[in-house]
Every structure is written in structure tokens, then in C-alpha cells.
């Protein structure tokens, strides 16, 4: 009996040690996983290089370029913010090649889009959607894409970095008032340091919708109401609608008054127009169940901000 008791105690002790070892191993694995998630890169970018306009060229250079851009955007840590893998910003970079020469010169359009999830909804809302028609650069197959914030000597990586910073900064602004300032300052820095490379899109007095104009306009103090709009519209408005649709819609209506203020304070700004183009269908849907008073007020503001879409804004009244 003593032997049996000793054996039982020994066996119990062994099971306890194995259990403790299992728990310790599990904790270490979880800590490692959480640490890995906390330092995940910010972007989950889908990249497409469309070369359908280019005939009689070895297609491998376009495939290699697509892979290189994807790795450049998704493997780099662009900010000091902590992102879990599930928090990555879903975005797309569609590079349309208009011209290509064998010496590696590309003339392209770049369509950039980014979205963020709406709280408690199986729905993503578009935050940024822009077509850059002045993306020219040099790239030889298998070139490594490298980038330095302070020394800009490659237009392709400068453009990609600029939009990466812009996307992240805008996304942060939707979650906290002016939350993306530090990252948006990096986008401004890219613009300033790209002045000397002699490529289109960076100059202060170029196209009113070029890269310089876009970030300079956004960071102008006169456009602070626009940055507040991004927070109020998304965080107080859309994110609230799953829990209380009436309150969320009311907050969106209030936020759109900031859009009107932006238009009045800086009538030449392109940002209010871009916002209405991006949010057009979403706004029509949001107000499909709005009150008559809400519909009238929103229709008035939107027709003032972007009269070219009056036909669309009238759908708000018709719903």
C-alpha cells in the first residue's frame, strides 16, 4: 500500500509538472504572438501593375515590379504606431503603365484607394480614393526598391512612400482628432525633399490636385475643420450607426456642417470635392432612412460643396 501511495504521489507530481510546463509553453507562445501582432506593419496593400497598353515587351519586368512594390509597401514599418495584424489598413495601388521603354523608363497613372472597417458592421468605408496621373520613374527589372526620408533620389519609392504616409495619417485621423499629424508630417517631408528630383507632381505651383497640393491643403490650419470632419463622420457617425442608427446619422449631419465651413473658408480647396466624390453612394444610403429635415439640410450642404453631383444629391430627397 505504501508503494502504491508513493507511486500515486509520484505520478500526480509528474502530471502537475507536465501541466505547469504546458501552461508556461502556452503563455510564452501567446506572448510571442501578441508581440508579433503589436509590431505588425501598417498596410495590407494589394498591388496591380496593369500593362495592357504595352505591346511587344517581355512581361516579366511588370510582374517583377508588381512584386517589388507589394513587398516595399507591406514589409516596411511606416510609423511608430502599434498595429495588430487584424488592424492593418486595407488599401490598393493600381499602377497603369501608359508608356514603357527598354531603358526602364515608365510613364504611369496610379490609382490609390484605402478603407477602414465600420464598428460592429461587416462593411468597410472608403477613406481615400485618388488618381495620380503623373507617376513617371525609372525601374530596371530586379532593382531593389529602397527609400530614405531625407535623401530622395528615386521617384517611384518617393511616390509610394508619400501615399503610404498619407493613407496611414488619414486613417489615424478617423480614429482620433488630428491623430495622424506625425505621419502626415512625414508625407509633407517627402514632398519637400522630392523637389530636386525634377519629376512631375511635387511642385508647389503645379496642378491643383498634385501631391504637393493635396497634403499641403490638408495640413493647412484653415482646413482643421476638414480633419475634424473625418473624425466626427467616421468615429461618431458611421461607427455609432450599428448601435443607434438615428444618433449615428444625426452625428453625420452635424459633421457635414464642417464640410460646408471648409468650402466657405477655402473655396479653392479640392478636399471637400474629393470627400463628396468618395462618399457619394454612402451618403445616399445613410439618408435613405433619414428624416425630411435631415435630408433637406444634407442636400443643401452637398449641393453647395459639389454642385456637379446635384443629380446624385437629389436622390437623397427622393428616397
Residue spans for each PLM region:
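Sec/Tat signal peptide C-region and signal peptidase I cleavage site
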Residues: 34-40
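Flexible, glycine-rich surface segments
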Residues: 179-268, 272
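Acidic/His-rich structured neighborhood in mature extracellular/periplasmic domains
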Residues: 104-216
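Bacterial N-terminal signal peptides that target proteins for export
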Residues: 15-25, 35
Amino acid at each position: 500500500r505504501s508503494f502504491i501511495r508513493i507511486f500515486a504521489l509520484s505520478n500526480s507530481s509528474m502530471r502537475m509538472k507536465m501541466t505547469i510546463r504546458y501552461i508556461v509553453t502556452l503563455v510564452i507562445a501567446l506572448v510571442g504572438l501578441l508581440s508579433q501582432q503589436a509590431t505588425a506593419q501598417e498596410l495590407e496593400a494589394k498591388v496591380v501593375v496593369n500593362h495592357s497598353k504595352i505591346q511587344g515587351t517581355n512581361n516579366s519586368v511588370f510582374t517583377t515590379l508588381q512584386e517589388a512594390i507589394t513587398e516595399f509597401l507591406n514589409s516596411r514599418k511606416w510609423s511608430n504606431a502599434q498595429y495588430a495584424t487584424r488592424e492593418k489598413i486595407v488599401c490598393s495601388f493600381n499602377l497603369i503603365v501608359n508608356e514603357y521603354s527598354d531603358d526602364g523608363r515608365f510613364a504611369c497613372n496610379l490609382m490609390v484607394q484605402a478603407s477602414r472597417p465600420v464598428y460592429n458592421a461587416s462593411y468597410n468605408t472608403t477613406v481615400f480614393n485618388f488618381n495620380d496621373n503623373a507617376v513617371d520613374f525609372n525601374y530596371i527589372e530586379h532593382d531593389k526598391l529602397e527609400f530614405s526620408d531625407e535623401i530622395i533620389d528615386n521617384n517611384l519609392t518617393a511616390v509610394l512612400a508619400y501615399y503610404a504616409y498619407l493613407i496611414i495619417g488619414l486613417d489615424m485621423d478617423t480614429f482620433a482628432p488630428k491623430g495622424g499629424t506625425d505621419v502626415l508630417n512625414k508625407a509633407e517631408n517627402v514632398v519637400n525633399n522630392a523637389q530636386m528630383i525634377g519629376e512631375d507632381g511635387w511642385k508647389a505651383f503645379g496642378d491643383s490636385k498634385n501631391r504637393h497640393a493635396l497634403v499641403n491643403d490638408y495640413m493647412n490650419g484653415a482646413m482643421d475643420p476638414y480633419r475634424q470632419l473625418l473624425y466626427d463622420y467616421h468615429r461618431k457617425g458611421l461607427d455609432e450607426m450599428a448601435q443607434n442608427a438615428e444618433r449615428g446619422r444625426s452625428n453625420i449631419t452635424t459633421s457635414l456642417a464642417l464640410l460646408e465651413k471648409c468650402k466657405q473658408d477655402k473655396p479653392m480647396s479640392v478636399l471637400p470635392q474629393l470627400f463628396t466624390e468618395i462618399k457619394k453612394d454612402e451618403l445616399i444610403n445613410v439618408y435613405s432612412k433619414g428624416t425630411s429635415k435631415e435630408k433637406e439640410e444634407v442636400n443643401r450642404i452637398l449641393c453647395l460643396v459639389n454642385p456637379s453631383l446635384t443629380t446624385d444629391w437629389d436622390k437623397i430627397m427622393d428616397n
